[in-house]
Amino acid sequence: MSDTLKKYYYKKIVPKLIDQFKYKNIHQVPKLVKVTINRGLGEASQNAKALDSSIKEIATITGQKPVVTRAKKAIAGFKIRQGMPVGVMVTLRSQRMYEFIERLINLALPRIRDFRGINPKSFDGRGNYSLGVKEQLIFPEIEYDKIDQIRGMDISIITTAKTDEEGRALLKEMGMPFRSN
């Protein structure tokens, strides 16, 4: 399934970007490096059941078991001790990354309520894009009956692009539905 996006990238997107930005070498063309998906547990960090359900959901969505992130320092105001689980994250590369991006663009994003496109200003200045998802139900792999609570996640798409303009062009060619301002 994901081979299609990768093949499309090399056959169609690379020549377009070389034309658009006048690259002299094919290795200058921006490409996807990795996708990281992160979910902070918030007040659910005291609840072991919430941690387990988050691990299962992220694993179902990505096809890869997430890593549990732990608190570096104790914070009394949040009732967090050092070493307590505070979130889960997963890093996708190569095959799984392309599969996830394809599912995100074609299946998940169109299922968001009142969706008009994603914010084109969420680039970090170096061609990487981050977006927040408010609920996990937009992914077709998640069954409505099996979730205990609606939780969101952060998705970061890391590219080799040097500027936001290059990163935006790459993602737009891949089919990312940016909102027109």
Swiss-Prot record:
Keyword ATP-binding belongs to the record: no
- One Pfam match, by short name? Ribosomal_L5
**Per the UniProt entry, what is one GO biological process?**
translation
A single GO molecular-function term is: tRNA binding
User: Which Gene3D superfamilies does the entry link to?
Assistant: 3.30.1440.10
Q: Which UniProt keywords apply?
A: Ribonucleoprotein, Ribosomal protein, RNA-binding, rRNA-binding, tRNA-binding
What's an example GO cellular component term for this entry? ribonucleoprotein complex
PROSITE patterns per record: RIBOSOMAL_L5
What InterPro entries does UniProt report for this protein, alphabetically?
Answer: Ribosomal_uL5 (IPR002132), Ribosomal_uL5_bac-type (IPR020930), Ribosomal_uL5_C (IPR031309), Ribosomal_uL5_CS (IPR020929), Ribosomal_uL5_dom_sf (IPR022803), Ribosomal_uL5_N (IPR031310)
What this chain does, per the entry, is described as: This is one of the proteins that bind and probably mediate the attachment of the 5S RNA into the large ribosomal subunit, where it forms part of the central protuberance. In the 70S ribosome it contacts protein S13 of the 30S subunit (bridge B1b), connecting the 2 subunits; this bridge is implicated in subunit movement. Contacts the P site tRNA; the 5S rRNA and some of its associated proteins might help stabilize positioning of ribosome-bound tRNAs.
Q: How does it assemble?
A: Part of the 50S ribosomal subunit; part of the 5S rRNA/L5/L18/L25 subcomplex. Contacts the 5S rRNA and the P site tRNA. Forms a bridge to the 30S subunit in the 70S ribosome.
Q: Extract the PANTHER family matched here.
A: 60S RIBOSOMAL PROTEIN L11-RELATED
**Could you say which protein family the record assigns here?**
Belongs to the universal ribosomal protein uL5 family.
Protein name (database record): Large ribosomal subunit protein uL5
Give the species: Trichodesmium erythraeum (strain IMS101)
Gene behind this chain?
rplE
